[in-house]
């Protein structure tokens, strides 16, 4: 088991004309994070993602924030997704599936994940305002689209109800975190097998 845990890490360095991003993850962590993207609300959400998934994350992003937050948020999602995919390897022994209905005050959001290697996002979340502070609410979807695409995750997000846009965004991140926490765990009954009748998830 110790050998498996030691191997479940992934690092990515991604540099474009718009952003420079480095990400390291440990799937068998305790939810420790060191995050700096230059976007305060986004840092707060990524801290929730790490803390509630128990995936250790180190994220440093420098982007063209003088234009807007879009490239930084999307490219960070790409890099986190790629790092998680590396950490999962051939995905042997993982639980694979998980879902949760997560409550926060007046808000309830459902996340369901399948670490299938087949990226797909179903997004049923609506915000009542274009911004949370200075953060564009449309970027929440952009982040999860990038994450799912690059981690090889089928991800469904459904906001059942909620009035506070901060709470809606935060429950999306926390629900995905809790689902990832379960889905990435090693199932001892799998005995190192790939959890698919096809014999592969990549």
UniProtKB/Swiss-Prot annotation:
The keyword Glycoprotein does not apply. The keyword Amino-acid biosynthesis applies. One of its GO terms (biological process) is L-histidine biosynthetic process. It catalyses: D-erythro-1-(imidazol-4-yl)glycerol 3-phosphate = 3-(imidazol-4-yl)-2-oxopropyl phosphate + H2O. GO terms for molecular function: imidazoleglycerol-phosphate dehydratase activity. Pfam families: IGPD. Keywords: Amino-acid biosynthesis, Cytoplasm, Histidine biosynthesis, Lyase. It is an enzyme of class 4 (lyase). InterPro entries: IGPD_sf, ImidazoleglycerolP_deHydtase, ImidazoleglycerP_deHydtase_CS, Ribosomal_Su5_D2-typ_SF. Its EC number is 4.2.1.19. It is found in: Cytoplasm. GO terms for cellular component: cytoplasm. This is Imidazoleglycerol-phosphate dehydratase.
């Amino acid at each position: 088991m110790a050998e498996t845990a030691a191997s479940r890490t992934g690092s990515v360095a991604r540099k474009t004309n718009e952003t420079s991003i480095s990400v390291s993850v440990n799937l068998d962590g305790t939810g420790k994070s060191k995050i700096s993207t230059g976007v305060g609300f986004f840092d707060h959400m990524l801290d929730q993602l790490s803390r509630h998934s128990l995936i250790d994350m180190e994220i440093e992003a420098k982007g063209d924030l003088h234009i807007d937050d879009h490239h930084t948020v999307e490219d960070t999602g790409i890099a986190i997704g790629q790092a998680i995919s590396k950490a999962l390897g051939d995905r042997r022994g993982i639980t694979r599936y998980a879902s949760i209905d997560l409550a926060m005050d007046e808000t309830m959001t459902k996340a369901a994940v399948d670490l299938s290697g087949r990226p797909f996002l179903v997004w049923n979340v609506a915000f009542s305002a274009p911004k949370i502070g200075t953060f564009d609410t449309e970027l929440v979807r952009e982040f999860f689209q990038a994450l799912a695409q690059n981690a090889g995750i089928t991800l469904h997000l459904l906001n059942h109800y909620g009035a506070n846009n901060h709470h809606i965004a935060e429950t999306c991140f926390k629900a995905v975190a809790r689902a990832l926490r379960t889905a990435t765990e090693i199932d001892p009954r799998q005995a190192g097998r790939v959890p698919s009748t096809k014999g592969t998830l990549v």
